[in-house]
Amino acid sequence: MEATGFPTSADIYLELDGRKIAVVQGYTARASKSSQSVEAFGESEPVATIEGQRKYTLELTRLYATEDAVTDGINFYELRDFSLVICKPDRKVIYSGCQWSAIQEEGQLNAMVAEKVTVVASKRIETTA
């Protein structure tokens, strides 16, 4: 059995119009669903549940723009409808239709800028690597 390794920061990136525009050092993904219970008169427990819409929220840390993106003048504050691509050893996870909902920057003298971007995605798909 061959060990393929874990994702690295080069394996997590933002994509816009098929082009890699930034690499991401870390991420946290949360999925939620607005499911509801169906109650019936006279029943002590719900009789069914209805699947609701899914919502994908991602926290990205330490984004670094690619050289091409810097040359093209891409600004994180103006990004819309982009994708987050996460390459894992056995599959690729793509969050598409992304919009940012919060951008946080922290800076100190003689230290790197730490960025955190909160993203909401409309779709999540998995493909085999």
What residue spans do the PLM features occupy?
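Short, cysteine-centered beta-strand-loop-beta hairpins and adjacent loop/turn segments enriched
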Residues: 67-69, 127
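Hydrophobic lipid-interacting interfaces of membrane-associated proteins
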Residues: 120-127
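Short alpha-helical interface elements
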Residues: 39, 84-85, 125
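Solvent-exposed edge beta-strands and adjacent loop segments
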Residues: 1-64, 89-116, 129
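Short, acidic/charged, Gly/Pro-enriched secondary-structure junctions
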Residues: 70-96
